[in-house]
């Protein structure tokens, strides 16, 4: 039996009405906004990769892949510096 939530919302219709297609999003971004979005997405992605490396060590008791952690931290620094520059923020 469907829940009240499922009866009230048709997710396919909601997405069709509310979600912007990628071309529309891209067309609305100027160069500065695209840079900010790119660097923020990069931070998010690299954070997830760092979290996964730490999770594997802590939860699954695997040897910490220090080289990977160092690489992910470097990647985070890269995107964070790009975002700082894009926002005019200094360290």
List each model region and its residues.
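Flexible "arm" and connector segments at domain edges
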Residues: 1-91
